[in-house]
């Protein structure tokens, strides 16, 4: 499967990005530790992967751990790291068996060496899978993403490999996370919070946004189908007029 030749279905997103929000609050409302919510959140993530495989959605990007999440209580951060290692031990083999390609975006250098090794092994194991590309944003921030891309171009200019006037949106975008994938068609955030929280700031310029009050641990196929039904009813303009969209055809979505 060539990523840039994935057929466009105007009623079904090729690429969904999700902020999995509400694990801690879901647990606290039940007088349980926040870590209980994170465990339930992993199950919700797996349900979402199952749904995407069933529907033929080709790309799913999940915001698992932001660059700002390092400021949370140390015990919660440590739990998330330990849970991640255990997940890679059990879950990756199952994802591989089902044809899921696993990727990670974000700043890995802050993670424990053992966890980074698990990430690398997961990527290598699943690299040739094509049913679904699952990108996990870990220690990721949208501003950080843009800054690193700008820094890379600045280094090329300083080294004489690039002229400043050669820099344009396309070139900057090539240095961003998910550069080889089409931008997300749909962005979903759970828990009733209506903001994008520094997630994929560059990549979601023309993405359809959808918010739900459902907490992430309770997110399921019924809620996700509601999101897809809403998406199918929308007309994506990309800055064009109705007449221009009609002349190009509704399925003409920029890559």
UniProtKB/Swiss-Prot annotation:
Is-annotated flag, keyword Cytoplasm?
A: no
Q: Which organism is the protein's source?
A: Xylella fastidiosa (strain 9a5c)
Residues where substrate binds: 22-26, 34, 38, 66-68, 70, 72, 189, 195-197
The record's listing under PANTHER family reads: DEHYDRODOLICHYL DIPHOSPHATE SYNTHASE 2, DEHYDRODOLICHYL DIPHOSPHATE SYNTHASE FAMILY MEMBER
Q: State what protein this is by name.
A: Ditrans,polycis-undecaprenyl-diphosphate synthase ((2E,6E)-farnesyl-diphosphate specific)
Matches recorded under Pfam families: Prenyltransf
Q: What class of enzyme is it?
A: transferase
The entry's free-text remark on the cofactor is: Binds 2 magnesium ions per subunit.
Q: What is its biological role? A: Catalyzes the sequential condensation of isopentenyl diphosphate (IPP) with (2E,6E)-farnesyl diphosphate (E,E-FPP) to yield (2Z,6Z,10Z,14Z,18Z,22Z,26Z,30Z,34E,38E)-undecaprenyl diphosphate (di-trans,octa-cis-UPP). UPP is the precursor of glycosyl carrier lipid in the biosynthesis of bacterial cell wall polysaccharide components such as peptidoglycan and lipopolysaccharide.
Active site, per annotation: 21, 69
EC number of this enzyme:
2.5.1.31
How is this protein organized at the quaternary level? Homodimer.
Instruction: Please list the cofactors this protein needs.
Output: Mg(2+)
Per its record, the protein catalyses:
8 isopentenyl diphosphate + (2E,6E)-farnesyl diphosphate = di-trans,octa-cis-undecaprenyl diphosphate + 8 diphosphate
Any single GO CC term annotated in Swiss-Prot or TrEMBL for this entry: cytosol
Mind listing the UniProt keywords for this protein, alphabetically?
Cell shape, Cell wall biogenesis/degradation, Magnesium, Metal-binding, Peptidoglycan synthesis, Transferase
Task: Give the molecular function GO annotations.
Answer: ditrans,polycis-undecaprenyl-diphosphate synthase [(2E,6E)-farnesyl-diphosphate specific] activity; magnesium ion binding
State the taxonomy lineage.
Bacteria, Pseudomonadati, Pseudomonadota, Gammaproteobacteria, Lysobacterales
> At the top level of its lineage, which domain of life is listed?
Bacteria
**Is Transmembrane helix one of the keywords?**
no
* UniProt family annotation: Belongs to the UPP synthase family.
- Residues binding Mg(2+) are 21, 208
HAMAP family per the record?
A: ISPT (MF_01139)
Which SUPFAM superfamilies does the annotation name? Undecaprenyl diphosphate synthase
Q: Name one GO biological process term.
A: peptidoglycan biosynthetic process
